[in-house]
Amino acid sequence: GKIQSEKVVRGLKRPNNVDIEYGLKIGGKKVDIAVTTERMNHQLRIYSLPDMKPIDNGGIPMFEGETGTEFRDLMGIALYKNPKGKIYAMVGRKNGPTTGGYIWQYELSDNGKGQVKATFIRKFGTYSGKKEIESIAVDDALGYVYYSDEGVGVRKYYAEPSKGDQELALFATRGFSEDHEGISIYHTSARKGYILVSDQGANQFHIFPREGSAKNPHEHPELKVVKVEAKQSDGSDVTAVPLNKTFKKGLFVVMSDDKTFHYYSWEQIKKHLF
């Protein structure tokens, strides 16, 4: 791919993670958005797609009122669109409480002036205190949010606030060499697919069933480990949408620490599963 320099956003103070969502209603129109965490300014930045124009009135402060060391230093971000069309941001930070409430959830909406506002909804999520939490991923269709508690495992919660804050699962607790990092979700049908989790230090991904087991939807046994060429990957994404002749069943993109992105067809990943 080629960088579109006219759409590059510069001058942010340590942008950390990014996610996209479709159809946020602004000024009576549906707008696709890209949202990134700006760590050192303790705020979200929101841009319309595909033009990458800021629509956040200069930035939206996060974790207001928190005073602990690095408790406002933003890291992970994942967006969730519920069945009614409401869009939420799940936001993580460099450090946080070990007593619950590590992730804060905000509803994104029109402020009435053509810009986006964020309304605090809830805080949830266990943190081991061992390392940090960066990678967050949401399964819109099934209504779950997952995040990597580095060095511990992947934690699973309901994405919908009304369903409560209880932890549904802690999986991927064995076989990782160092940090648990990027989480990607591949759909094979409306309710089935795979969860891919980066084992950063080993340059590989552990793969788990999206739908859980036959007896328990919150039981995610490991299916396979797949090696990749990317080094120290802490970011990835996957789509099941057919893109072209090379990526007929989707594309898995993996970030490498040499500032490159590695592209894999889903067929390259799938051959290791069966």
Regions picked out by a protein language model, each given a short descriptive name:
Residues 175-221:
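Loop/turn-rich, solvent-exposed surfaces of beta-rich toroidal or solenoidal domains
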Residues 14-30, 71-87, 129-143, 181-191, ...:
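Structural signature of eukaryotic scaffold interfaces centered on beta-propeller domains
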Residues 234-274:
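Blade-level signature of beta-propeller repeat domains, shared across WD40, Kelch, NHL, RCC1
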Residues 2-11, 53-68, 117-127, 166-174, ...:
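A short beta-strand motif characteristic of beta-propeller blades
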Residues 1, 23-26, 46-56, 105-117, ...:
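Short loop/turn segments immediately following beta-strands, especially the blade-tip
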Residues 42-95:
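Asp-box/WD-like beta-propeller blade repeats and closely related beta-sheet repeat scaffolds
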Residues 1-42, 61:
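Blade-loop segments of beta-propeller domains
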